[in-house]
Amino acid sequence: MWKKYKTTLILTTLISLFPMVIGLLLWNRMPDTIATHFGTNNVPNGWSSKTMAVIGIPLFLAALQIFTAVLTFSDPKRQNIGPKMIRLVLWIIPVTSLIVCCSIYANAVGIAVDIGFVSNGIVGLLFILIGNYMPKCKQNYTTGIKVPWTLHSQENWNRTHRLAGWVWIIGGVAMIVNSFLQLEWILFLTIAALVLIPIGRASCRERV
C-alpha cells in the first residue's frame, strides 16, 4: 500500500506545506500578530505570531498528514479500506491547509474573508463526502464508527454505517446552511448528532 500511494502522499504533503510559500511571499504585508481563530460573526478570539501562522501551522498540518497516512497504511485490516476512502483521507488535510491558511493570510493583509462562511461550508462538504462513503466502508481500525460493537460484528458494522451515512450527509447539509446563519448551536447540535446517533445505534443493535 505504501508503494501504491507513495506519490500521492508526497504530493499531498507538499500541498499541505504550500501555504508556507504563500505566507513568506506576503510576509512583509502581514502584522507581527495574526488572528488565527475566529468565533461567531467572524470575530477573532485567538491570535498567533506571524512565524507560527506562516510556518508553524503548515508544518503541523504536514506532520498530521504523514501521521494520518501512517495510521491508515498500518491498519491490520487496511485491505478493507477502499481506494476512494484512502484518497479522501489523503486529500482532506492538504485541501484544508490551503483554504484555512489562505483565508488567515487574506484576513491578515486586510482582504475581507467571511471565515464563518468558509469554515462551515468546508466542514459541510466534508461531512457529505464522508457520509457518501460510510455505507461502503468495510470493517477496519482507522476509518468509520470504530466502537467495540461494530468491530465485534460485521452485521452491526454494516447497519450502523448505513445509518451513519445518512446522518453525516444530513449533518453536512445543516453545516452548509449554517454557513449563511453562523449559529453556534447548529454547529454543536450537528456534531453531537454525528457522533451520538451512530454510536447509539451500534449499542442498541448489539443489545437486541
Where are these regions (language model features)?
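Residue-level detector of conserved catalytic or cofactor/ligand-binding positions
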Residues: P198-V208
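Ordered, amphipathic secondary-structure segments that act as subunit-interaction surfaces
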Residues: A69-F117
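Select subsegments of transmembrane alpha-helices in polytopic membrane proteins
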Residues: T8-L11, V54-F60, R87-V95, N158-I169
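Membrane-water interface of transmembrane alpha-helices
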Residues: L25-M30, A62-S74, L129-G144, S203-R205
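Active-site and channel-lining beta-strand-loop segments
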Residues: G23-I55, T143-H152
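Membrane-helix boundary/juxtamembrane motif in polytopic membrane proteins
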Residues: T143-V167
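Alpha-helical transmembrane segments
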Residues: T12, G46-L61, D114-I130
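Small-residue-rich transmembrane alpha-helices that serve as helix-helix interface/gating elements
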Residues: I122, W185-G200
